[in-house]
Amino acid sequence: MSKKTGKKKHTFFIVMAIILIILIAAAVMLMTHTQLIVGAIQNLSAATVNTKNLYEPLGTPMEGMKENGQYIITEIRYSDRFPNSYLDITYPDENRLTSRPTLIYFHGGGFFGGSKNIGDPLAGSDATSLLDDICAEGFNLVNVDYVLVPEYHFPDPLIQVNEAFAFLMEHAEQYYLDMDRVVMMGSSAGAIITSQMGSVITNPDYAEILGIVPTLKAEQVKAVVLDDAPLVYDQFSIGTKVLVGNYVKGSIFLGQEEIRKYNNILWVDSNYPPTVLLGSEYYIDMRSMHDALIEANVPHELIDPLAERNLRMPHCFVASERADAVAKDAFDRMMGFIAEQVK
């Protein structure tokens, strides 16, 4: 080999090494500063979904009948402490004096976007029609907004929704809400909140490590519905680690204590509320919760189309219950379970 050829190869390897070092450095930067990625997603999503933390309501407050005959009150301010502290209440009809159980719902959106008005930008189905259909089954439905990254992180949304519970307790008579028959439900990120609040309310040790004094008592929460909650951090894909890691600390590299606080499956005991688990994209997490609930002897139902039908369903598939037979079956099973718990 000539000296000239050898020199060219040497130069090539140096250039490739430099490029590799730059790529590794960029990857490390992104993985330890995840808001760079999530912020870009927020910017791309901002035209269609809420990605902001706002002290003013997203919409004009209104009260009255919907086209489907349900009665709604929107943009009720439940706290002055955090932005996005608004909720809507929907009743099956205008007769609000009828005693009905209360279902409190938290939307998804990776903690970077979404709202009670629109739902989850990461789910491919219509969460708003799902809520109408739940309400039509005889529930007063409370749809709650909460804070987003980058200004707020875990456990801020839990602290905030605890304030929403306090507001609902204080104003239960005003809004004709039965706060002794409560069901909590969430989809995706909202399912994470729901799952964790289930432990905050029923396990004093978990509440203590998060610094939360729960407003609701365990006996008030008759059931929880976890719609595809990513909870087992070590089993996440890199994409989910970016979203959840960003929510927890702004990095995918969570310590064991941070994971221990985040994954409330580790804190499930016999006092955890009766539970519906809907598993699709995060079926592994829902199966892990299923195992914990079995060990704790907690009544629950796991709805897992992959295990039951060998079908891979999309994230939060139950929201497609108007158009898809598998989703409709899941909806019917979910509603049947929680109806039994609120009797």
Locate predicted features:
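Juxtamembrane low-complexity tails/linkers enriched in Ser/Thr-Pro and polybasic
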Residues: 1-6
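Alpha/beta-hydrolase superfamily serine-hydrolase fold, recognizing
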Residues: 7-343
